[in-house]
A protein has these predicted regions:
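Auxiliary Fe-S-binding modules of radical SAM enzymes
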Residues: 1-60, 256-363
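N-terminal [4Fe-4S]-dependent radical SAM core
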Residues: 19-118, 133-137
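Short loop/turn segments at strand-loop or loop-helix junctions that form parts
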Residues: 118-120, 128-132, 230-236
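Conserved alpha-helical substructure of the radical SAM core
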Residues: 133-169
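Conserved AdoMet/S-adenosylmethionine-binding subsite of the radical SAM
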Residues: 155-168, 173-303
Length: 363
């Protein structure tokens, strides 16, 4: 098992060079495959993601979309398909963007299509990752350096080329906070464009580099048109290490990073892959909820659990990591969802709190 902090230090000079940032190539990697109508490349290096894509949801009015009836799991989740287990697969970023920009009068469909920028370089080696390993490794054959201005020009061209609204720019990876200067520079460019919302993914591992630009980064992260999602890799240190390949001792660093975001008044959300090893699913989830509550009593209500699909790259990663004795758990993901939404959260929160969208939950 490796040290992700040292790995980040090695990757940083490759991810940022001469004022330009290393962006992953999408074309030819399998990520442009339009399997679920939600992944398609706009160009060689940039792609879109749709979050609300069911016809019956796209036809709803804004008021209907904000109904708590869309939250949680379907009835009888353990007998449903994994793909259909959640009533609304993703709340974020469309709901969080609409709420932050316009309150519950905002239409999530206006923030449904995200122009996605994928930085190359990750200090984890997750066994379920949706990104091909070569794309995450700063490989010059699968990446290219861009200035922030060049990237924003692509975004503006995409806005011209499509009829539906494109108001979200999503920064993913790789791990963005290894080069937090990218977030700062990108926001400064997007600030000139009215109505734009910036969504930032992070694996909560790079506080060292965040703190190096604390003043500028903190100023960006507290803005109303910025949201951050921190992806926790597992509910305990043992599972964290199996998932990421990192040493168990770095499990706690995720909570330190989340606390830093909260201290900086960031609009923070949490992703949690539905991957739990062994038979103690409820016990592990209960312990994880308590760890989040130690940071903020309402933070578990801002968790969006992720379904792990076997996308082409994910399937490759699963096969590779299985050979390294790090297979994804055999535990049925539906059981993890059921434990989180139907058994553990109701122990700690009222029906009123459970009926709120993540973005409505105060921190």
């Amino acid at each position: 098992m490796f040290d992700p902090v040292k790995r980040a230090d090695m990757l940083r000079p490759l991810m940022l060079k001469n004022g330009k940032f290393l962006i992953s190539r999408i074309a030819g990697t399998g990520e442009e495959v339009k399997e679920d109508e939600d992944r398609i490349a706009y160009s060689t290096y940039f792609k879109f993601k749709w979050y609300i894509d069911l016809p019956e949801q796209l036809s709803l009015s804004p008021a209907e979309l904000w109904s708590p009836n869309l939250l949680g799991l379907v009835d009888n989740p353990l007998s449903s398909s994994l793909r259909d287990i959640k009533k609304l697969e993703f709340q974020n970023p469309p709901f969080s963007a609409a709420f932050r920009m316009k309150g519950k009068h905002g239409d999530p469909k206006d923030y449904n299509r995200a122009f996605t920028i994928q930085l190359s370089g990750c200090n984890y080696n997750c066994n379920y990752c949706f990104v091909p390993p070569e794309t995450n490794a700063c490989n010059p054959n699968f990446s290219k350096y861009f200035s922030v201005k060049e990237i924003v020009d692509y975004f503006l061209k995409a806005r011209e080329d499509f009829n539906e609204p494109i108001n979200v720019v999503r920064v993913t990876g790789g791990e963005n906070m290894i080069v937090p200067e990218f977030v700062i520079e990108l926001y400064n460019e997007l600030e000139k464009i009215d109505g734009t919302y910036l969504w930032i993914d992070t694996n909560l591992s790079a506080t060292k580099h965040m703190e190096n630009v604390e003043n500028e980064l903190k100023d960006v992260l507290k803005r109303r048109n910025v949201g951050v999602t921190g992806c926790f890799k597992g509910t305990c240190k043992e599972d964290f290490s199996l998932i990421t390949g990192a040493q168990q001792s770095f499990f706690d660093d995720q909570f330190k990073a989340a606390k830093l975001f909260l201290d900086w008044k960031t609009d923070l959300y949490v992703y949690l892959p539905a991957l739990v090893y062994g038979n103690s699913v409820e016990q592990k989830i209960d312990g994880f909820v308590n760890m989040l509550q130690a940071l903020n009593k309402n933070l578990p209500l801002r968790v969006e659990m992720l379904i792990i699909h076997e996308y082409p790259a994910a399937k490759r990663n699963m096969e590779l990591k299985s050979k390294e004795k790090r297979p994804i758990p055999l535990t049925d993901q539906r059981k993890v969802f059921d434990s989180w939404y139907n058994k553990i959260l109701p122990k700690y929160y009222s029906k009123e709190m459970l009926s709120k969208f993540c973005c409505e939950v105060p921190l």
